[in-house]
A protein has these predicted regions:
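Structural preference for beta-strand elements that scaffold enzyme active sites
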Residues: 39-43, 76-79, 114-116, 134-135, ...
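A generic "binding-loop/recognition-motif" signal
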Residues: 47, 120-121
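Active-site-adjacent loop and "lid" segments of alpha/beta metabolic enzymes
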Residues: 27, 52-61, 65, 85-103, ...
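Short helix-capping segments at alpha-helix termini
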Residues: 108-113, 197-200, 238-239
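N-terminal amphipathic alpha-helix/helix-capping segment at the start of soluble metabolic enzymes
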Residues: 1-48, 196, 290
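Glycine/serine-rich anion-binding loops at beta->alpha junctions
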Residues: 48-57, 75-82, 203, 209
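Catalytic domains of carbohydrate-active enzymes, especially glycoside hydrolases
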Residues: 65-81, 269
Length: 295
């Protein structure tokens, strides 16, 4: 059971990190003041394999409609993916991905909605940027140098995801042997240096809590790990860049109330000072964040 005493101990051990500030910047003409106002990123899934059925759109029209609804509900950015990160999901080739992504990107950008594209493919990244994408949500390290250069050339922001593997579809076991934060800090420091050398100025860091590692299939182990990282987010902010979290569903615990899971995890992520919330439940997360501001 999570207790107040544990939160107090965490803060006492890392008091200096609690006051860390991160870079603020504009994306596509929109200013993000992360230190005073967290942002929300809504999700549109173009893959039929995606687990969160409410976010799945199987046509361009449905995807554009959902993107516009998310923006109207308060999403600052709409994140689009054409290949599920689920371990059993089908692989989707570059041409098939771009065939789905590009029409949606173009229509949402025409509506002045900021668009992020989740990918680990340089070819998909290039096509998405040329179509007007504002953010690359990178779920792999292979080819990252190329994609960083592409992002810099288009003045796009980059979300660097922590991945223990070549990409999100090729991961094994997550190292749970010790405190994960120093390991993530080292990984992000290396990737930040590579990105900055490539000319990327707008960087966001994502611990990758939604990825399917083999040894995190046990629900209690996985959720305990996720909760721990959410609450320790402020320690990663010492790197000087905003932190993004993809909010999980924890169906094993929430069952028929699974749509309440992301709001629950949003509370923990907010306590940890998360800067960007990636969610399938935009209005619920907006309500949580607005309510927490009242205190």
């Amino acid at each position: 059971m999570l207790k107040l005493e544990q939160l107090a101990e965490l803060l006492e051990k890392n008091s200096a990190a609690a006051s860390a500030r991160v870079r603020e910047f504009s994306i596509g003409g929109k200013r993000f003041n992360f230190n005073s106002q967290p942002a929300v990123m809504g999700v549109v899934n173009l893959s039929p394999d995606s687990w969160y059925r409410e976010s799945v759109c199987l046509s361009t029209e449905a995807a554009v409609r959902r993107g516009k609804v998310l923006a109207a509900q308060g999403a600052d950015i709409v994140d689009i993916g054409a290949e599920s990160t689920l371990a059993h999901a089908a692989r989707v080739g570059g041409p098939a991905q771009t065939g789905k992504l590009l029409p949606v990107i173009k229509e949402l950008r025409a509506a002045r909605i900021l668009v992020s594209v989740e990918t680990y493919s340089p070819k998909v990244a290039r096509a998405a940027l040329e179509a007007g994408a504002n953010v690359l949500n990178l779920t792999g390290t292979a080819g990252s140098r190329k994609m960083f250069k592409m992002a810099a050339a288009h003045d796009a922001a980059v979300i660097i995801c922590f991945v223990q593997g070549k990409n999100v579809r090729e991961v094994g076991n997550f190292d749970l042997s010790a405190d994960s934060i120093p390991m993530m800090r080292d990984y992000f420091s290396r990737q930040i240096e590579i990105a900055q050398r490539a000319g990327v100025e707008k960087i966001i860091l994502d611990p990758g809590l939604g990825f399917y590692y083999r040894n995190l299939q046990d629900s209690a182990v996985r959720v305990r790990h996720q909760m721990n990282i959410f609450l320790n987010t402020f320690r990663l902010r010492e790197l000087g860049f905003p932190i993004c979290h993809a909010l999980p569903h924890a169906f094993e615990f929430f069952g028929e109330e699974v749509r309440c899971a992301e709001p629950f995890f949003a509370v923990l992520a907010a306590l940890g000072k998360t800067d960007l919330f990636r969610t399938h439940e935009v209005p619920r997360i907006k309500a949580v964040l607005e309510t927490m501001k009242v205190f």
